[in-house]
Amino acid sequence: MAQLKYNKDIDELERNAAKWWPDFLAKKESSTSIIPKLVESQDAFISLLNLSKNNPFDIFQLIDASKFPPNLFLKHLVVLTDFGGEPLNRLNQNFDSLFPMIPYGIHYITKVLGKFEFFWNEKKYEYVFQELPVTSLTNSKLKIDGASISKTVPLSDLYKDVIVLLMFGANAVNSEVSEVLMKCEVGNLIGKTDELKKFIKERYIFVSRITGGAEANTLGQVAQTHVIDFLRTRFGSKGHDIKSNGHIEGVTHNDGQTLTTFDVVIKKGSKSVAIEISFQVTTNSTIERKAGQAKARYDMVSDTGNYIAYIIDGAGNFQRKNAITTICNNSHCTVAYTEEELNVLLKFILEKLE
């Protein structure tokens, strides 16, 4: 019987590759993908903005009455303004320096709240924040990431605070605020149906990198999670320690100051196998980054008496032949993302760790 070959070259790897996402992974990904939800709800989102033409704050009643998920409404605004994640959290951290804090009292109970003044339809409006600033303002907290965008949430004061900023921020009376939020001008198109549709179409194209990045991240997470589940099913009761984003003792970077992180690490006793995963249907720079790190990682892992394996697949990756070749030359085991190939990886791990 021929000995199983673990360290394939690029041609052998491509012959065994799936190239396109397997159905079971695509189904997992679609349950967490943001893009379809934005496309499906775009017309309803536009309708809400068109109806809110008498008062800028009517939008809150309309969201409530229509049962439109406030986190999905906010996600539309984040994509259209290109102002979410880190920029939004940075605004939250600098909140006190941008918005005047005013004491408000009801029945002698005083609370200090931030105030936002802005122009809309040639009138000046004032909005008093009820929740901002908060300890941390992240996509997960706002339920606008892939994992939680489908969750049912109420229209809280925090949502109202952020929606007002993203809709009218560019119209702030305070020039410093309007400069920070210069892209937050969706509110200026309320009631202007044709202009609003044109703006939204153009902005979705312009910021497609946000949704594209979200999709790539989600797909990558699904692929990594499936590998971990696959390994745990087969090794869970055999004393193997399996970790996502794991480390190997002695494998470092930054002049030895930081342990190197691998997508998956499986360990038994003193031996470990690090696993790096890349499945790209469309070409991007992820595989180039992994290739750039491949030799140094291979050398360090080998020097510590351990092993490194790669799971590489996707039509986009195989367009980067030099990168794939570099990885194949600096790997103890290289497999594609099919059940048959994952079983080859399984045999490699058994051979090296048992």
Swiss-Prot record:
Transmembrane segments: none annotated. It comes from Aneurinibacillus aneurinilyticus (Bacillus aneurinolyticus). One of its GO terms (molecular function) is type II site-specific deoxyribonuclease activity. Homodimer. GO terms for biological process: DNA restriction-modification system. The lineage of its organism: Bacteria, Bacillati, Bacillota, Bacilli, Bacillales. Pfam families: RE_BanI. This is Type II restriction enzyme BanI. It catalyses: Endonucleolytic cleavage of DNA to give specific double-stranded fragments with terminal 5'-phosphates. Keywords: Endonuclease, Hydrolase, Nuclease, Restriction system. Its EC number is 3.1.21.4.
